[in-house]
Amino acid sequence: MIKVTIDEQSLEVEAGSTVLAAAERLGIEIPTFCYWKRLPPLASCRMCLVEIEGLRRLQPACATVAADGMVVRTNTPLIEETRSSMLDMLLANHPLDCPICDKGGECELQDMVMAYGPGESRFRDPKRVFHSKDIRLSPVIIMNVNRCIQCQRCVRMCEEVVGAVALGTVEKGMDTAVTGFEGSLASCDQCGNCVEVCPVGALMSFPYRYKARPWDLAETDTICPHCGTGCQLTVGARKGEFMRVRSDWEHGVNRETLCVRGRFGLDFIESRDRIKRPMIRRDGTLTPVSWEEAGDFLRQRLGVAEGKAAGGLISPRLPNEVLYQFQKLMRTVLRTNNVDCSSRWSAPLDILVPIVASFYSRDPLEQVIGKDCVLIIGGNVTEENPVTEYLLRDAARRRHTRLLMLSARPSRLDADARAVLRAHPGGEGQSLAAVVAALVAVTDEGLPDDIFAKTSGTTASSGANDALDRLVSTLKEGRSVTLLVSVDLLRSPLARKTLEQLGNLLQLLRLLGKEPSLQFLFDRANQMGAWDMGVLPGVLPGLSPIADEATRTRFERSWGAEIPREPGADVDAMLELCEKGGMGVLYVVGSDPLISYPDREFVERALGAANLLIVQDAFLTDTAGLADVVLPAAGYGEESGTFTNNEGRTQALRKFREPAFDARSNLAIFGFIAALRERPLQPSTETVIFEEMTRLVPAYEGLTWEGLGADGAFTTSAPKPWTSGFFAPLSAPAVTDVLQLITGNCLFHNGYVSEHSETLNSVADDPFIEMSAQDAAGLSLSDGDQVLVRSARGELTAKLKVNRRFPHGLVFVPENYRALRLNSLMRRGEYPCPVEIRECAKRAASALDEERV
């Protein structure tokens, strides 16, 4: 620690701290323009100049490292004159259009001029004008170059934090201007972080343009509803209508940054596809009715359907309190453990739960990725969890964390990684087994004898040996290791085997003293919370097995009802039960299995065979189109609760308006259903349910609603001993020359909910098919061609996107476009999906030739 004195106030700071950071700790304000906390100091704006005793010239506080015994003054006549002169120079060419500028009322230049600027400008010359009109750089970002003060925040944010490198400067001197490539941002991430950090109105949000002033907005701090990173954001609404999103440096895992979905994708709540009133099926047609009529219909149709003849499926996008109450409703009112929270895959709980219990880290992401090594397994973190990617890039570049990649899809983070090991989709388990075997082989001592027998005979795929050697040597050298695992691993029919190999690697790292931490990279906002709340067929809240007598008794006493003893059916088994005519009632909340579960034909047949299909949602989904009863539920921002993100951080989800139309909150609808069965469901409010959760779920003990604050609160877990031992290695996957189709989220969408966003659709409305340049050339295809993808079960058409970094033999189709009906190509229990591709025009010509013959 060193001692510094600033404006006659002394304090001790860590060596390496800047004068600006020391002043902030004392509450002394030093004005800045170019400085931003997530970026290295630039010291170009000269607003933060201070006097340092013993130095002749003023020094920039943002870039000057404090020294022991240093004496600093921040508010002398010379400093005041210098600041005033700097502001006068900025105003010399700054347009006087504050009344029409969107930044009016929250402009840093306005604030600085009022606090430190001259009362009158010395300059009388005509102002420099680049363009007479604003330039629309992209569908969501618009620019007024005349207002730019050349702080370079936007350029550096785009390059150093986001990694897109879409903005840059052209010309020099007075003619310097910020712009995109060829005056456009068409190829950038459209995240809007440049807009967020712009201190003036140079970069603006086009969807928000001219809509409101900051003082007109009612602002609500809440959580992003898209991926599992759990970014904190502030929604601005006027008279209940969504206007914009901004974020705050001080709070949340994201520290002010957001991705395109979080900043521009929340307008989905204003979609025209909202369900306005309850509907029941009459004469084969869904007919709008009142809640009373819907209740009468349900009372007649529900009958005595319960137990194994009842099932429930709910979305992991909903709050913890809704998820908790749903599984409680299913178990105590409908008397069934047939509950699940995924409509895309069935998780092998018998291996997943022990891994989570033994290795999952509920620590801040910044702490977890600050370890010596971070191994990212599966998926594409750039597109699935963009803000997590920002944090990982920062860790690699500024904190010297060693990144390692093991996945099928390329990622922008590959450029910052020490080793990139390409895995075959569905073959991640084989790659993990190869890592374990290689790590055991280079370890001299300290390992049990049985490890060598259970990990021998596994080798990496052809061409991967160099990458494997680099990855293993980095793991061996590292003092501590974090594993970030994509949910892609759960899509494969080999998910169980893959998780076994993940367990092997975690065990081995623990034996080697690497202090392994595990976190999943969930692509749904509350998937972690859904697991914690027990929305799974074989566990109760807290991931406690149904078969555990003591745990079951504790919940039965609290709920005042008996819980079925046998584990229930997962989504796959429930659909099979429906198809066979054994499902009396299937209750689907916020989920759409008809569009998301593999084999659309099977799912449609199964849902149609259910005796009673109840769909509760904010939007009219494909599954709702088959329902017997449709109940309009509150959408995002219309009910309160909590989300638990990938870190295990529980955060408050706050509503900013009442449910639209005739919709009701999900909790109110659960109470409505329970009342029809004459089995009241208590408690019924978010806060009281939260209190019950904190009493019954060990990881949530000690949390309070009031204590969540702006940063949320971390759940806790004491790692349980691993008792499963080491699993046998996997055999090598079969090699095939057939193109293999994989799926996942694209950067601009998340699931299907984001398709209701007009803004996101303006950025990425058209579906696409992505493949390597090598494969495209082999098929005589070019970027932008309309192509046909055909499997044994179906086909689809979309534009081709050629990616030179994409692996040979793979085809990627995003899961986010409902019109594609991607699941109609897939077979249950098969992933990846073998396909063939051809150009649509060639296919049409071929068909015409066949007709002529």
UniProtKB/Swiss-Prot annotation:
<feature type="binding site">
    <location>
        <position position="101"/>
    </location>
    <ligand>
        <name>[4Fe-4S] cluster 1</name>
    </ligand>
</feature>
<dbReference type="InterPro" id="IPR054351">
    <property type="entry name" value="NADH_UbQ_OxRdtase_ferredoxin"/>
</dbReference>
<dbReference type="InterPro" id="IPR017900">
    <property type="entry name" value="4Fe4S_Fe_S_CS"/>
</dbReference>
<keyword id="KW-0004">4Fe-4S</keyword>
<feature type="binding site">
    <location>
        <position position="259"/>
    </location>
    <ligand>
        <name>[4Fe-4S] cluster 3</name>
    </ligand>
</feature>
<feature type="binding site">
    <location>
        <position position="98"/>
    </location>
    <ligand>
        <name>[4Fe-4S] cluster 1</name>
    </ligand>
</feature>
<dbReference type="InterPro" id="IPR000283">
    <property type="entry name" value="NADH_UbQ_OxRdtase_75kDa_su_CS"/>
</dbReference>
<dbReference type="Pfam" id="PF10588">
    <property type="entry name" value="NADH-G_4Fe-4S_3"/>
</dbReference>
<dbReference type="Pfam" id="PF00384">
    <property type="entry name" value="Molybdopterin"/>
</dbReference>
<keyword id="KW-0874">Quinone</keyword>
<feature type="binding site">
    <location>
        <position position="198"/>
    </location>
    <ligand>
        <name>[4Fe-4S] cluster 2</name>
    </ligand>
</feature>
<dbReference type="InterPro" id="IPR050123">
    <property type="entry name" value="Prok_molybdopt-oxidoreductase"/>
</dbReference>
<feature type="binding site">
    <location>
        <position position="94"/>
    </location>
    <ligand>
        <name>[4Fe-4S] cluster 1</name>
    </ligand>
</feature>
<feature type="domain" description="4Fe-4S ferredoxin-type 1">
    <location>
        <begin position="139"/>
        <end position="170"/>
    </location>
</feature>
<feature type="binding site">
    <location>
        <position position="231"/>
    </location>
    <ligand>
        <name>[4Fe-4S] cluster 3</name>
    </ligand>
</feature>
<dbReference type="Pfam" id="PF22117">
    <property type="entry name" value="Fer4_Nqo3"/>
</dbReference>
<feature type="binding site">
    <location>
        <position position="48"/>
    </location>
    <ligand>
        <name>[2Fe-2S] cluster</name>
    </ligand>
</feature>
<dbReference type="InterPro" id="IPR009010">
    <property type="entry name" value="Asp_de-COase-like_dom_sf"/>
</dbReference>
<feature type="binding site">
    <location>
        <position position="224"/>
    </location>
    <ligand>
        <name>[4Fe-4S] cluster 3</name>
    </ligand>
</feature>
<keyword id="KW-0830">Ubiquinone</keyword>
<feature type="binding site">
    <location>
        <position position="62"/>
    </location>
    <ligand>
        <name>[2Fe-2S] cluster</name>
    </ligand>
</feature>
<protein>
    <recommendedName>
        <fullName>NADH-quinone oxidoreductase subunit G 2</fullName>
        <ecNumber>7.1.1.-</ecNumber>
    </recommendedName>
</protein>
<dbReference type="GO" id="GO:0046872">
    <property type="term" value="F:metal ion binding"/>
</dbReference>
<feature type="domain" description="4Fe-4S His(Cys)3-ligated-type">
    <location>
        <begin position="78"/>
        <end position="117"/>
    </location>
</feature>
<feature type="domain" description="4Fe-4S ferredoxin-type 2">
    <location>
        <begin position="179"/>
        <end position="209"/>
    </location>
</feature>
<dbReference type="InterPro" id="IPR010228">
    <property type="entry name" value="NADH_UbQ_OxRdtase_Gsu"/>
</dbReference>
<dbReference type="InterPro" id="IPR006963">
    <property type="entry name" value="Mopterin_OxRdtase_4Fe-4S_dom"/>
</dbReference>
<dbReference type="InterPro" id="IPR006656">
    <property type="entry name" value="Mopterin_OxRdtase"/>
</dbReference>
<feature type="binding site">
    <location>
        <position position="227"/>
    </location>
    <ligand>
        <name>[4Fe-4S] cluster 3</name>
    </ligand>
</feature>
<dbReference type="Pfam" id="PF04879">
    <property type="entry name" value="Molybdop_Fe4S4"/>
</dbReference>
<comment type="similarity">
    <text>Belongs to the complex I 75 kDa subunit family.</text>
</comment>
<dbReference type="Pfam" id="PF13510">
    <property type="entry name" value="Fer2_4"/>
</dbReference>
<keyword id="KW-0411">Iron-sulfur</keyword>
<feature type="binding site">
    <location>
        <position position="151"/>
    </location>
    <ligand>
        <name>[4Fe-4S] cluster 2</name>
    </ligand>
</feature>
<dbReference type="InterPro" id="IPR036010">
    <property type="entry name" value="2Fe-2S_ferredoxin-like_sf"/>
</dbReference>
<dbReference type="GO" id="GO:0048038">
    <property type="term" value="F:quinone binding"/>
</dbReference>
<keyword id="KW-0408">Iron</keyword>
<feature type="binding site">
    <location>
        <position position="107"/>
    </location>
    <ligand>
        <name>[4Fe-4S] cluster 1</name>
    </ligand>
</feature>
<dbReference type="GO" id="GO:0051539">
    <property type="term" value="F:4 iron, 4 sulfur cluster binding"/>
</dbReference>
<dbReference type="InterPro" id="IPR001041">
    <property type="entry name" value="2Fe-2S_ferredoxin-type"/>
</dbReference>
<keyword id="KW-0479">Metal-binding</keyword>
<feature type="binding site">
    <location>
        <position position="34"/>
    </location>
    <ligand>
        <name>[2Fe-2S] cluster</name>
    </ligand>
</feature>
